[in-house]
Amino acid sequence: MELSPNNSTDQSLLDAQLELWHTTFAFMKSMALKSAIHLRIADAIHLHGGAASLSQILSKVHLHPSRVSSLRRLMRVLTTTNVFGTQPLGGGSDDDSEPVYTLTPVSRLLIGSQSSQLAQTPLAAMVLDPTIVSPFSELGAWFQHELPDPCIFKHTHGRGIWELTKDDATFDALVNDGLASDSQLIVDVAIKQSAEVFQGISSLVDVGGGIGAAAQAISKAFPHVKCSVLDLAHVVAKAPTHTDVQFIAGDMFESIPPADAVLLKSVLHDWDHDDCVKILKNCKKAIPPREAGGKVIIINMVVGAGPSDMKHKEMQAIFDVYIMFINGMERDEQEWSKIFSEAGYSDYRIIPVLGVRSIIEVYP
Ligand SMILES: C[S@@+](CC[C@H](N)C(=O)[O-])C[C@H]1O[C@@H](n2cnc3c(N)ncnc32)[C@H](O)[C@@H]1O
């Protein structure tokens, strides 16, 4: 016999607690994902043709013998969060039937690593690294107090993020690879969804372009476009050498090499209003007038643009608070528009074809 609370106040209390628990324990979803990446469970299932029982997964992942029985519990979280699926087993009682785990569109993004065009494991590994996660414990205090440094990341680690990437090679690789994996996926979609953005230009400089994943994708799709990357010297030092893309060490706050178009992907949301204006003023000096094809191509969120379902809205809101850790922000159209006009641009066009993100073409 099923017992349930017999008064609606009790039921509402339980519902409220459940809702609260969902948010309180949401970090366990992230930690389960982090474990799955660490154990390379997606690869193990992939090696079994996309569907594998627990014992087949166990034959491919390295587990301490005492932890074997816990893997099923981890898989239960990963299936309820849609990272993996399960195949119903025909016959046998529930107790003795072994579930078969399958890849979902989500876990297909976890197969392989840098070698795979779509692999998103490096970005997840970056976001879930303690260096990035730990500053958020200070978020409440940051709202209340004048901290010695207004940047939560700097407050926690004693250095800004780009100073830390300079000093810590492991963290630098984590950031470079993480962002490169995102660039590979999103720039590929941008090229397919909005090829006209890259047509009609003969040169492009990717400012803050990291190790060049976006520039390489553009150069491959549009071989007539001469692509270069401007980034800090310690990042450029790690860039690939056998590529058509030219890497230039420099500081975007000082000067930007000339090109028909400047790409800024996941860069401006790292900076406050005034810094964005400074960067865009330098971009304007680097490009020809609008009539000659000059433009800045931004890939970032435009809060409120794109699909308006709850998942997209929630992700934009979460990302805006996430990027607070380095004093960055996600912006709505009005906020972007103010930056563009202060930096001396005449017009812009938002192309909301990248899910939670958009392409913005900005014209001098
Ligand atoms: C969030 S990452 C984006 C990387 C790349 N655009 C992507 O999305 O894959 C920001 C990049 O800006 C670079 N950066 C930071 N300060 C810079 C500066 N003053 N001049 C040039 N690049 C800078 C960082 O080294 C880093 O590669």
UniProtKB/Swiss-Prot annotation:
GO molecular function: O-methyltransferase activity; protein dimerization activity; S-adenosylmethionine-dependent methyltransferase activity
One GO biological process term: methylation
Tissue and organ distribution: Accumulates preferentially in the roots and is located predominantly in the region of the endodermis, low levels are seen in the leaves, stems and other shoot organs.
UniProt function note: May be involved in the O-methylation of suberin phenylpropanoid precursors.
UniProt subunit comment: Homodimer.
Protein name: O-methyltransferase ZRP4
Species the sequence originates in: Zea mays (Maize)
Family membership noted in the UniProt record: Belongs to the class I-like SAM-binding methyltransferase superfamily. Cation-independent O-methyltransferase family. COMT subfamily.
Residues where S-adenosyl-L-methionine binds: 208, 231, 251-252, 265
Top-level class of the enzyme under EC nomenclature: transferase
PROSITE patterns linked to this entry: SAM_OMT_II (PS51683)
Keyword line: Methyltransferase, S-adenosyl-L-methionine, Transferase
Active site: 269 (proton acceptor)
InterPro entries: COMT-like (IPR016461), O_MeTrfase_dom (IPR001077), Plant_O-MeTrfase_dimerisation (IPR012967), SAM-dependent_MTases_sf (IPR029063), WH-like_DNA-bd_sf (IPR036388), WH_DNA-bd_sf (IPR036390)
Disulfide bonds listed in the record: none
Enzyme Commission no: 2.1.1.-
One Pfam family per UniProt: Methyltransf_2
